[in-house]
Regions:
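Conserved beta-strand-loop-alpha-helix junction that forms the acyl-donor binding cleft
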Residues: 126-136, 153-157
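Conserved beta-strand in the GNAT
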Residues: 58, 65-73, 95
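A short helix-loop-beta-strand connector motif used in the catalytic cores of GNAT acetyltransferases and
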Residues: 43-58
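Conserved active-site alpha-helix within GNAT-family acetyltransferase domains
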Residues: 107, 111, 119, 131-149
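Conserved acetyl-CoA-binding loop-helix of GNAT-fold acetyltransferases
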Residues: 93-96, 102-115, 142
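A short beta-loop-alpha structural element at the N-terminal edge
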Residues: 2-17
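Conserved GNAT acetyl-CoA-binding A-motif
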Residues: 118-128
Length: 157
């Protein structure tokens, strides 16, 4: 397996994997997510691939087929004046193809992202997990992540 930055040729495969992630979220929150859609379009992915502040890392097999990805964003913190300034690498989305889960691809991808964050001078790696996505929560806890903050909601409908 080779972990590298995404290329434009990866876009069709990224779309397939984005569909898998969307379905997980739609199963958890059908009131918010629309099945059969994706978070990004082909055009948006093409722009993101060129943007060094939004690196997309892919785990490719020996045939250079993308088996998983990590969409990342470099963010400057803080959100307010009462915090020390620092750089954070936010994982916007991480996915491993359902057919290849359990082969430690996600672990290798996450370790790669952590090393990239160190190389970029980041203080931390952060991400969000939807409540109800217990397999993702368990995976990230296994990788050493701890809850930083919780966002709560009250649905009015």
């Amino acid at each position: 397996m080779n972990i590298r930055r995404a290329h434009e040729k990866d876009i069709p495969r990224l779309i397939e994997l984005l569909e898998q992630v969307l379905q997980i979220h739609a199963d958890i929150r059908p009131d918010i997510f629309i099945p059969g859609t994706t978070k990004y379009t082909n055009e948006e992915l093409a722009e993101m691939i060129k943007d060094d502040t939004k690196p997309i890392y892919v785990a490719a097999d020996d045939d250079d087929i993308c088996m998983g990805y990590a969409f990342c964003q470099i963010r400057q913190q803080p959100f307010s004046n009462n915090m020390v300034p620092f750089t954070s690498l936010f994982i916007d989305d991480l996915c491993v193809d359902a057919k290849t889960r359990g082969q430690h691809i996600g672990e290798q991808l996450f370790e790669y992202v952590k090393n990239e964050a160190k190389h970029l001078g980041c203080y931390e790696v952060t991400l969000n997990v939807w409540s109800g996505n217990t397999s993702a929560e368990k995976f990230y806890e296994k990788m050493g992540l701890k809850t930083k903050e919780r966002q709560m909601e009250y649905i009015l409908m």
